[in-house]
UniProtKB/Swiss-Prot annotation:
Keyword Secreted: yes
Keyword Disulfide bond: no
Residue spans of biased composition, Polar residues class: 106-116, 138-153
Location of this chain's protein in the cell: Secreted
Record function comment: Is able to cleave peptidoglycan and affects clumping and separation of bacterial cells. Is required for normal growth under stressful conditions. Is essential for nasal colonization.
Protein name, UniProt field: Probable transglycosylase SceD
Cystine residue pairs: none
Biological source species: Staphylococcus aureus (strain NCTC 8325 / PS 47)
Single GO MF annotation: hydrolase activity, acting on glycosyl bonds
Pfam families: Transglycosylas
């Protein structure tokens, strides 16, 4: 699953310089907060998609709690990915080429172009997956439901496509690796931020379809489709 982001201008102080200025090193040679970077990657923190982890060129690879993480930049483009240690495929990767040449202390205009996200291209290489893993299978309870007939919530066409890609429309789907659950594969922290009080702390997969639909609409209306890798 690949996610590409394009930025037309950079925020203050990013310090990105075109060319290969900077340094390259493995994580063992650098003072990196591995736990923090791993957590940001696992949760698809948008900070990683908006700017590099440091100025200049770098190339870091490290293992942490069963996963291998890679962060790199040539000073113009930056990217990151991670995958289960010992496997060849990356769970998630992101690239953000900077189109402007910027001095380290330069201040740019604060206009930022909307992120452009690649949709899955074909059935062979892009299967409906949970938000954070290409290598995980979504499982469901025996009472699964795969239609939206049980909901009266008005869900737009884009959200319906997201639901199909994330879970096949199954409201009881659960990703055993990431813990993402429900029709829209909510992470628990995201679900708790948009779910009604009655369902906070409850797995999204155990909530009625109408509640899941309403939460997804709320999340979509406030943050757009960027919450879903498959959007």
């Amino acid at each position: 699953m690949k996610k590409t982001l394009l930025a037309s201008s950079l925020a203050v102080g990013l310090g990105i310089v075109a060319g290969n200025a900077g340094h390259e090193a493995h994580a063992s040679e650098a003072d990196l907060n591995k736990a923090s970077l791993a957590q940001m990657a696992q949760s698809n923190d948008q900070t990683l998609n908006q700017k590099p982890i440091e100025a200049g060129a770098y190339n870091y690879t490290f293992d942490y709690e069963g996963f291998t993480y890679h962060f790199e930049s040539d000073g113009t483009h930056f990217a990151w990915n991670y995958h289960a240690t010992g496997t060849n495929g990356a769970d998630m990767s992101a690239q953000a080429p900077a189109t402007n040449n910027v001095a380290p202390s330069a201040v740019q205009a604060n206009q930022v172009q909307s992120q452009e996200v690649e949709a899955p291209q074909n059935a062979q290489t892009q299967q409906p997956q949970a938000s954070t893993s290409n290598n995980s299978q979504v499982t469901a309870t025996p009472t699964e439901s795969k239609s939206s007939e049980g909901s009266s919530v008005n869900v737009n066409a884009h959200l319906k496509q997201i639901a199909q890609r994330e879970s096949g429309g199954n409201i009881h789907a659960v990703n055993p690796t990431s813990g993402a659950a429900g029709k829209y594969q909510f992470l628990q922290s995201t679900w708790d931020s948009v779910a009604p009080a009655k369902y906070k702390g409850v797995s999204p997969a155990n909530a009625p379809e109408s509640v899941q639909d309403a939460a997804a609409v709320k999340l979509y209306n406030t943050g757009g489709a960027g919450h879903w890798v498959t959007a």
